[in-house]
Amino acid sequence: MILGVGTDIVYIPRISNLWKKFGIKFLTRVFNQKEIEDSYKYTNFDAQVRHFAKRFAAKEAYVKALGTGFGQSIKMSDIVILNNPYGKPQITVSNSNPIHKIELSISDEKDYAIAFIVIYNANIKL
């Protein structure tokens, strides 16, 4: 059973501007250390910005799917987006309900990054 669907689109230059303005403070407030380390595989700044923009969109899409938004119960850094060995993005959330399964798709084109999330009950076959 589908419990929630969320989508978000991010203007990539916005993420670039935030990073340039606030530096590491921006990154550590929004991203988990593993996500930051994962960006090191990209040697140029633009590729790193795209990496972070897609993950930013995924985090926003996740809380939209939950219907809660960000607040005291969940922070952006509680949501971790990493790729599996095959390149598929996967989401891990601190203190999430273990019976929830989360499917994530992220993409970028020109100045925009987009994410789409479906949360469903893992005990019920789709």
Curated annotation (Swiss-Prot):
Function: Transfers the 4'-phosphopantetheine moiety from coenzyme A to a Ser of acyl-carrier-protein.
Cofactor(s) the protein requires to work: Mg(2+)
One cellular-component annotation, GO: cytosol
Catalytic activity: apo-[ACP] + CoA = holo-[ACP] + adenosine 3',5'-bisphosphate + H(+)
EC number, as in UniProt: 2.7.8.7
Organism name: Ehrlichia canis (strain Jake)
The protein, known as: Holo-[acyl-carrier-protein] synthase
Enzyme category, top tier: transferase
Subcellular location: Cytoplasm
Gene: acpS
InterPro entries, per database record: 4-PPantetheinyl_Trfase_dom, 4-PPantetheinyl_Trfase_dom_sf, ACPS, P-Pant_transferase_sf, Ppantetheine-prot_Trfase_dom
Binding residues for Mg(2+): 8, 60
UniProt GO molecular function: holo-[acyl-carrier-protein] synthase activity; magnesium ion binding
Transmembrane segments: none
GO biological process: fatty acid biosynthetic process; lysine biosynthetic process via aminoadipic acid
